[in-house]
Amino acid sequence: MNKNQEEDILGDNHIATSAVTPLRADAFQMSETEKITEIETHVRAILHTLGMDLTDDSLKGTPKRVAKMFVKEIFGGLLPERKPSMSTFDNSYHYGEMLVEKNIVVYSTCEHHLLPIVGRAHVGYISNGKVLGLSKMNRIVEYYAKRPQVQERLTMQIVQEMQRALGTEDVACIIDAKHLCVNSRGIEDIDSSTVTAEFGGKFKDPEVRKEFLEYIKLDTRFH
């Protein structure tokens, strides 16, 4: 098997090589403006190679639009300064049960084909004395989703970040998402979705895990 075949198999199997986002040591040396300028040049070259007429009104602004979108939006989670503040509060009311934030929208990008991953995340924890503001869980999901990603890694990163912030292992996350690299190319299966889960601490107990899953299944639509 040659190197190209190995790379194709790795990409089509959606394998994560590590729970850490693979970044070079010099990843943050360029400014946002410098990155946008560099990416714009490469996008322009790609479209030119594909035979597109970049003088057309519809296309002439595309290289810059794509570059800005990459740096400021869909890959904005690569920038450390975008990481949300993870301040916690004392659990002064001594709430001792599970807290679950479910149906958090996930918009990410498959790092193997740079196509969208779209789905929902369900995140829960059991307080050991500290609590997070509810919106913080949504922001954690968004931050780690906004980068080239693998769903398994994303699931683990969300759990690990919450464990660090809360000082407890008792955190869980389930993500159910569609991968356009499966839906729109390759096998072209438009119906399948991928489910990943990471359970820490008390969530490894089958009864606690069952309770978490029951909360997720509750119908809480209000419109």
Residue ranges and their predicted role:
Residues M1-H223:
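A domain-level signal for the structural core that forms small-molecule/cofactor-binding pockets
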